[in-house]
Curated annotation (Swiss-Prot):
Function (record text): Catechol O-methyltransferase that can use various catechol-like compounds. Can produce vanillic acid (meta-form) and iso-vanillic acid (para-form) from protocatechuic acid (PCA). Does not have a regiospecificity, and produces the meta- and para-forms of the products in equal proportion.
Residue sites binding Mg(2+) per the record: 139, 165-166
Keywords: Magnesium, Metal-binding, Methyltransferase, S-adenosyl-L-methionine, Transferase
Domains as described in the record: Undergoes conformational changes upon the binding of S-adenosyl-L-methionine and the metal ion.
InterPro entries: Cation-dep_OMT (IPR050362), SAM-dependent_MTases_sf (IPR029063), SAM_O-MeTrfase (IPR002935)
EC number, UniProt record: 2.1.1.6
Protein name, entry field: Catechol O-methyltransferase
Positions that bind S-adenosyl-L-methionine: 41, 65, 67, 71, 89, 94, 118, 139
Reaction equations catalysed: a catechol + S-adenosyl-L-methionine = a guaiacol + S-adenosyl-L-homocysteine + H(+)
Subunit note: Homodimer.
Amino acid sequence: MNNQIFESVDHYISDLLGYEDDALLAATNSLAEAGMPAISVSPNQGKFLQLLAQLCQAKNILELGTLAGYSTIWMARALPKNGRLITLEYDPKHAAVAQKNIDRAGLTSQVQIRTGKAIDILPQLVEEGAGPFDMIFIDADKPPYTEYFQWALRLSRPGTLIVADNVIRDGKVLDENSTEPAVQGARRFNAMLGANTAVDATILQMVGVKEYDGMALAIVK
């Protein structure tokens, strides 16, 4: 089997179950318009995150890595009216684009964008007592994933779901000699996850329009 069949099946599934309305399509289109990288989750992955948030009955969600707000919109739509989502974005330009997309989706009152380095904002959230969060989605720069996860634990409660994207890196995580920072970060994260007694966890391989990668899912004990 080749990548083409995986992409075709991905489109087949999204046509049936991953419907994108005008707000989601606009968020996708805003990437090219703003000269931003096309690295958002796919429609099927967005729907998957939304379903996970619903399964958690999440009222309080934390996201690391906003980009244009595409995954933010998917997850925020799973919140009850009194729910909230805090999303962290390093690049002010990206945050501004995301804010427009979130406003267009009618989620202004539920979503707060915090701009700056996640590794700096996470301790602030702990100090503010912003947690515990019901669901935490990590989709930011890969080298500090392990540190992000440790802070995520401090912002969690028993039962919190922590999801981390891009942890397979097209299978490159099998190469222990890789010098790519993102691969090294993913390998370190995956090894930590396998040894972490504070969570029950697994990793799902994923193929499709985003090619070959994977998501880690961990439930805090």
